Amino acid sequence: MPEGPEIRRAADKLVEAVVGKTLTRVWFAFPELKPYEAELVGQQVRQIATRGKALLTYFSNDRVLYSHNQLYGVWRVVNAGESPETKRDLRVRLETQNRAILLYSASDIEMLTPEALTTHPFLQRIGPDVLDLSLTPEQVYERLLLPRFRRRQFSGLLLDQAFLAGLGNYLRVEILWQAQLAPQHTAAQLNEEQLQTLSQALLEIPRLSYNTRGTVDENHHHGAIFSFKVFHRDGESCERCGGIIERTMLSSRPFYWCPHCQR
């Protein structure tokens, strides 16, 4: 599944293609969305934003298209009138005079009003977005120590979107390496210095991944172009201590770490 940085980079491309432009053609695959096709033609795309791994497309008539890529969804930008050859199922087409954005394979798609947006179950459940620049390490520190999070092992907590939105497996792996923490630890077990280091890493690593423009293709959403320290490097030497990086399964996901310096 693509993580927060990949979703935000995809959104950046969509923004460049259609925001501020008038829609000339709208098509939805799902019957419940069909009534909105005619309504949206002639409207402008005002904004495209992300909340964790969800993408929100705002229109000038105050409708908001909610979509979540889940495992297989992917957005593409094409020229107006273009229909790429693909085995994927097209779900959404939003076209302007010159460009079109296409959503393939996703199944979690809804049209919302501003009021419904504030009560949407997924958006209500998720925590602060790690790519929101107003989120500070001090706020993350406080969140780590909340009663519902402070005794949960990091192996599961860092995958829980209710804790911080936008984190995923490669970020979990790299954050814990950066903080020199083993995955079985909890916030309640850490000292002040460890909590501060982890709080910094929880924001620095996702933002580094986003800012260094990771590469994404249809089948591999994990390839950010910054130096992975442990992710997919099992059997190699840890650059920090020289120990051997290991791979295991935690919370049903592959986990990479250096047992020698992550304690």
Curated annotation (Swiss-Prot):
Coiled coil: none
Chain positions of all zinc fingers (FPG-type): 229-263
InterPro entries for the chain: DNA_glyclase/AP_lyase_DNA-bd, DNA_glyclase_Znf_dom_DNA_BS, Endonuclease-VIII, FPG_cat, MutM-like_N-ter, Ribosomal_uS13-like_H2TH, Znf_DNA_glyclase/AP_lyase, Znf_FPG/IleRS
Residues binding DNA, per UniProt: 70, 125, 169
EC number(s) stated in the UniProt entry for this protein: 3.2.2.-, 4.2.99.18
Claim: Hydrolase is one of the keywords in the record: yes
Keyword hit for Ribonucleoprotein: no
Gene3D superfamilies according to UniProt: 1.10.8.50, MutM-like, N-terminal (3.20.190.10)
Any single biological process term in GO: base-excision repair
Homology family: Belongs to the FPG family.
Protein name, per record: Endonuclease 8
Organism annotation: Pectobacterium carotovorum subsp. carotovorum (strain PC1)
